[in-house]
Amino acid sequence: MRSLLKFKTAAIVAAAVGFAGFSTASMAEDTLRIVSWGGAYQKGQSVGIFQPAAKAMGITVKEDTYGGISDVKLMVKSGADKFDIFSSGAGGCASGGAEGILEKLDYSVIDVSNHLPGMYSDYCAGADIFSVVAAWNTETYGDNGPRSWADFFDVEKFPGSRAMRAKVDAQLEAALLADGVPMEEIYTVLDSEEGIDRALDKIRSIKPHIDVWWTSGAMHAQLMKDGEVDMTTGWNGRFDVAKLDGAKVAYDWKTGIMDWEGYGIPKGAKN
């Protein structure tokens, strides 16, 4: 029975990233619990993926939000049972897999034949690509906002309040790019304690100008909607939606640090 339930969980992950062909006849009346990041991103997942997949399979998908891989770790370590599938960036799943808190994914069920190289792993099936960018308030800078990470870190050329993520994801890369490290050498530099310290020191150099350390996409989008900061790091899609909602926000793709989002399964998930 448990293996059947695991198959159903893998099946809806497959629905999110591409079907490889499987029967859904036995899925009626089952419920799967999925958590993601909330806001416009999760709304898009729900409308475009979760609920259509649930309807096609004849199952119920219950959705909630969560705070990232630390929530998965807490759930698994405590023996709690809160969700079956979670949406995560590649780095979060890599960390969770290394800690032994995730199930290995079954790629005989999940079709990744059309994925870009490296966009799936033992613990995370990629679903979409995004970029971390430097966005600015157009009421402050007009069309002349930060066009590079060097600009974002230049508080004399671009005075004003800033926000950055309260986690290292893409922030270390941005800091090193601002510090003059060539793009092709970023991860060579970050593969040493000295390189990490260099990136952290660069972030510390503008810490007095960072008013907010954001913790979610909804939060950094709201910062720009409210005009609370003059510039922030964040995910391009969130800024696109915020602009549609009236936010005075712009960004330059030249600051883009590409990453991918996918789906993982917690170790011992009920379904």
Q: Where do the protein language model's features map onto the residues?
A:
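Bacterial N-terminal signal peptides that target proteins for export
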Residues: 1-12
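Extracytoplasmic ligand-binding site segments that recognize negatively charged/polar headgroups
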Residues: 39-44, 82-83, 87-223
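Short amphipathic alpha-helical coupling segments at ligand-binding clamshell hinges
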Residues: 45, 49, 59, 147-148, ...
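A ligand-binding cleft/hinge motif common to bilobed small-molecule-binding domains
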Residues: 91-95, 231-248
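Periplasmic-binding protein-like
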Residues: 112-115, 130, 197-206, 243-269
